[in-house]
């Protein structure tokens, strides 16, 4: 048997006797044979190599919504759009020599969403919802083989302001988001506020609601870097990107953490 480039593989992982975690369907795009010993390495990607998803395109969208743009691209590639998307008006947005997935990721991130393609699904995840969910597991220092955690004030802001003047009506739209970091996070032991900086967001908005969403999303996106780190531990299938964990007995860095990237190696 020899797999063909473009064939698909369905991957599940976990422990014998336990429920397996479905990792989705992958398209084979590279096969490598090496020796000694005889080893065959099969590499694949989550999006089909036969799809036009990676073709760069330039075009504009006018008088539409984020959900409509996502739906249009999903239909173009015969994907099922999964996830709840707020009714966000967009006067105009331009795709500049970008792949459809790259463009959607850029656009969605401005409004607080993450985008990925899994098999035949285009999945939108609301980041604020992910941050508010319950942790899937508690971890103590003895559960972890190695860890590195960092607490910083770099790229941390007290507020974010969006300001845009509509060319059609000359109306100035301004919105300021405040309180993106907790008071306990903003203070040092001496009681000093660690960041009083304001984030200026230069972005086109269609109305006050879209300005609010962009300001809140930009503030949350920057301030999530205040505390970040990495953990290495024995394989745990439920620890996937988008889930939360709770660190226990890690001192001031204890508490809930959102998983942004997970790598499982065998």
What function would you assign to each model-found segment?
Residues 1-49:
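Assembly/oligomerization scaffold segments
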Residues 1-4, 144-266:
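An acidic/polar, Gly/Ser/Thr-rich interaction patch typically located in mid-to-C-terminal regions
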Residues 34-37, 64-82, 206-208:
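Glycine-rich, acidic and aromatic/proline-enriched surface loops and short helix-turn segments
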Residues 4-8, 21-23, 37-39, 76, ...:
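Extracytoplasmic
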Residues 39-48, 85-149, 153:
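Short beta-strand-centered interaction patches in the first periplasmic/extracellular domains
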Residues 50-72, 82-106, 110, 233-235:
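Short acidic/polar beta-strand-loop edge motifs in secreted extracellular
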């Amino acid at each position: 048997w020899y797999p063909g480039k473009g064939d698909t593989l369905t991957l599940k992982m976990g422990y014998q006797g336990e429920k397996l975690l479905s990792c989705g369907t992958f398209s084979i795009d590279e096969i490598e044979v090496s020796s000694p010993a005889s080893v065959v390495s099969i590499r694949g990607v989550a999006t089909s190599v036969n799809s036009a998803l990676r073709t760069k395109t330039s075009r504009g969208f006018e008088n539409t919504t984020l959900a409509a743009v996502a739906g249009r691209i999903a239909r173009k590639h015969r994907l099922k759009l999964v996830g709840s998307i707020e009714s966000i008006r967009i006067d105009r947005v331009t795709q500049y020599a970008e792949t459809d997935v790259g463009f959607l990721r850029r656009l969605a991130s401005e409004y607080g969403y993450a985008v990925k393609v899994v098999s035949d699904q285009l999945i939108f995840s609301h980041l604020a919802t992910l941050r508010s969910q319950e942790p899937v597991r508690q971890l103590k220092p003895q559960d972890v083989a190695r860890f590195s955690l960092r607490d910083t004030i770099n790229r941390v802001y007290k507020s974010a302001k969006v300001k845009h003047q509509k060319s059609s009506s000359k109306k100035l739209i301004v919105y300021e988001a405040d309180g993106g970091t907790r008071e306990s996070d903003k203070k040092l032991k001496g009681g000093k506020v660690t960041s009083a900086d304001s984030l200026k967001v230069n972005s086109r908005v269609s109305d006050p609601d879209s300005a609010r969403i962009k300001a809140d999303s930009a503030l949350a996106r920057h301030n999530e870097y205040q505390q970040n780190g990495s953990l290495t531990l024995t394989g745990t299938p439920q620890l996937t990107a988008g889930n939360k964990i709770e660190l226990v007995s890690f001192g001031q860095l204890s508490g809930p953490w959102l998983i942004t990237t997970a790598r499982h190696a065998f």
